[in-house]
Amino acid sequence: MKKLIISCCLLATFSAAGAWADAAGDLQQRLDKVKSFHATFSQKVTDGSGTSVQDGEGEMWVQRPNLFNWHMITPDESILISDGKTLWFYNPFVEQASASLLKDATSNTPFMLIARNQASDWKQYHVAQKGDDFSLTPKSADGNLKQFTINVAQNGTINQFSAVEQDGQRSNYALKSQQSGPISADKFKFRPPKGVTVDDQRQ
């Protein structure tokens, strides 16, 4: 009887691991169908009790695996750009920019996961699938991300994604007007405007 229970437990473990692997593989394959795209998005942030904290809008350009431009327009403008090697973050209001190596960037943020779509990133999560909805839970509890969900159609179109932090704060992003196709290389270049203070962390 004891051997039977152990066997059943092992089978359940292997079955769950297989399901996670299949879900992660399906998610990566779907995202791979669209190599580059532009979309506008709306953002809604709520705290742990569900109270609205912030509403915002912006647009994004992605050219996988390592080129992206995330432009938050409202309520406070900010820009996150990767040229494939350097990750730039620019805050126009305070006239400050930071530069870090992309290879050192954390994969513990939803946008980085979507933009890079690298198998090594997905392996850090337990991935569950229900239709077009994918739920990701970090295998390590060290980061601030508690759960990440994303809705991706079979053709690779991302409809929405959300992130829940350890304190219960939830950020929802709904994508609109998504268009796939070539993107100008200029979208992935950043040159700090005159007068901007730069914190260079690449060394």
From Swiss-Prot:
Family stated for the protein in its record: Belongs to the LolA family.
Entry protein name: Outer-membrane lipoprotein carrier protein
Subcellular location: Periplasm
One Pfam family named in its UniProt record: LolA
Location, primary (coarse class): periplasm
UniProt keyword Signal, yes or no: yes
Gene3D superfamilies in alphabetical order: Lipoprotein localisation LolA/LolB/LppX
Endpoints of the signal sequence: 1-21
Function: Participates in the translocation of lipoproteins from the inner membrane to the outer membrane. Only forms a complex with a lipoprotein if the residue after the N-terminal Cys is not an aspartate (The Asp acts as a targeting signal to indicate that the lipoprotein should stay in the inner membrane).
Ranges for region Disordered: 174-203
GO biological process: lipoprotein localization to outer membrane; lipoprotein transport
Domain of life: Bacteria
CDD domains, alphabetized: LolA (cd16325)
Alphabetical list of InterPro entries matching this protein: LolA/LolB/LppX (IPR029046), OM_lipoprot_carrier_LolA-like (IPR004564), OM_lipoprot_carrier_LolA_Pbac (IPR018323)
Species this protein is from: Erwinia tasmaniensis (strain DSM 17950 / CFBP 7177 / CIP 109463 / NCPPB 4357 / Et1/99)
Subunit structure: Monomer.
